Amino acid sequence: MIHNRKTQTVVITGASSNLGIAIGKRLIDEKKEDAHLTIVVTSRTLRNVRVAIKTLKAHAVAKEVGPEVDFDYLLFDLADMTSINGALVELKLRFSRIDTLIFNSNAANYIGINWPLAMWRFTTQFKSEIENPSCMIQAVGVKSDDGMGSAYQSNVFGPWYMVLELTEQLKNGGKVIWISSITSSEKYVDLEDIELIHNKEPYKGSKRLIDVAHNYYSPKLEEEHGIYSYLTDPGIFTSSSASEYLNIFSAFGMYLMFYFARLIGLTTMNIDPYKGANVPVWVTLSEDPSALKREYRLGSRTGRWGTEMMDATKLQYEGSEEVGAYIDKGVGEWREKLKDQIN
C-alpha cells in the first residue's frame, strides 16, 4: 500500500502488545477532528498483526472515525538484522514521510518468578518491589542469531539502526519516541558488557541503554536532520510479560497490590495500559516538538482516584559516549554486511 494523501503516519513496533494496542486506541481517540491518521502496525507474526488491526479498526468505527484512519503493517523481527533491513526497504518504498516512530520494544527473556523472594520483598519492601520487581527471573547469556545480546539487539541496537537508516523519511520534524521504564538505572549496565550478555537483568539494562543512547543521539538528530527524540515511560501496567507466570489467584493478588499501591500514593500505578499510553500519545500529537523536554524522561502517571497526570524525570546520563560509540561501531559493521541486499 502506497500512501499519497496527506496524513500523519505513525509506526508502532510491538503494536500487538497490551501497550501497543493502547497506544493505537489513544491515537485514534485523541487525533484532531477530521485529521487523517495512518497507523503502521508491526509485529513478528501475521496473526498478531491481524488481531491488532482488527481491534484498532473496530475501535475507530466505534468512535465514528473509521474513514479517517488507515492501517498498514510490517512483519519483521528486531532480533534479526536481515529482517530489519527488509522492513527498512518496505518503509522507504511505501512512505516518503514518517511522522513518528514509536519503539515499544519489550524483549525480556523472562523464564519465571522467584516466589520465596517475591513474598519476602513484597512483605518487607513493598513500595520498591511493586515499582521495580526483583523477583522476575530472566535468562542470562541469550544471544540472537546475529550473535548479539538478544535484549540489546531487540530493544536498543535494532531500533537505533532503523532510526539512523530512516533519517530521510523522518527529517524536518519527525519524532522518535522511546518506551523506557521506571526500572531503568545505571546499576543495571556494565560498560564492559554493553550487549548485556552476562547481565542478570538484561531487560532493565536495555531500558537504561535506551536512555543513554537517546542522550547521545538526540542532539545530533536534531541538529543534522531536524528529528526529535523523546524518552517516555508508561509506568506500571498489566502486561503479558509477567502474566503468563500467574494463575488466577496470583493474578488477582497482583491487581489488588497495584490498586493498594495507587491508593497509598504511588502515581506510577497506571494499571490500565490505556493510561500508560497517555504520554507517548501526547508527545506524538504535540504540534511543537521543540518545546518538549527532551532531556527528561516523560512518564504517564495516575492519581489515587484514576486522574491521569504526567511526570518529568531528570536523568543522569553517565556512559552515553561509550554506549553511543558502541552502537555507531555496530551500525557501521552491519551497513557493510547488508550493503549487498536490496536497499
Curated annotation (Swiss-Prot):
The keyword Lipid metabolism applies. It catalyses: a 3beta-hydroxysteroid + NADP(+) = a 3-oxosteroid + NADPH + H(+). GO terms for biological process: ergosterol biosynthetic process. It holds the Pfam family adh_short. It comes from the Eukaryota. Keywords: Lipid biosynthesis, Lipid metabolism, NADP, Oxidoreductase, Steroid biosynthesis. GO terms for molecular function: 3-beta-hydroxysteroid 3-dehydrogenase (NADP+) activity. Its EC number is 1.1.1.270. Pathway: Steroid biosynthesis; zymosterol biosynthesis; zymosterol from lanosterol: step 5/6. GO terms for cellular component: endoplasmic reticulum membrane; lipid droplet. NADP(+) binds at L19, T42, Y203, K207, S239. The active site is at S180, Y203, K207. InterPro entries: Ergosterol_Biosynth_ERG27, NAD(P)-bd_dom_sf, SDR_fam. It is an enzyme of class 1 (oxidoreductase). Belongs to the short-chain dehydrogenases/reductases (SDR) family. ERG27 subfamily. This is 3-keto-steroid reductase. It comes from Yarrowia lipolytica (strain CLIB 122 / E 150) (Yeast). The gene is ERG27.
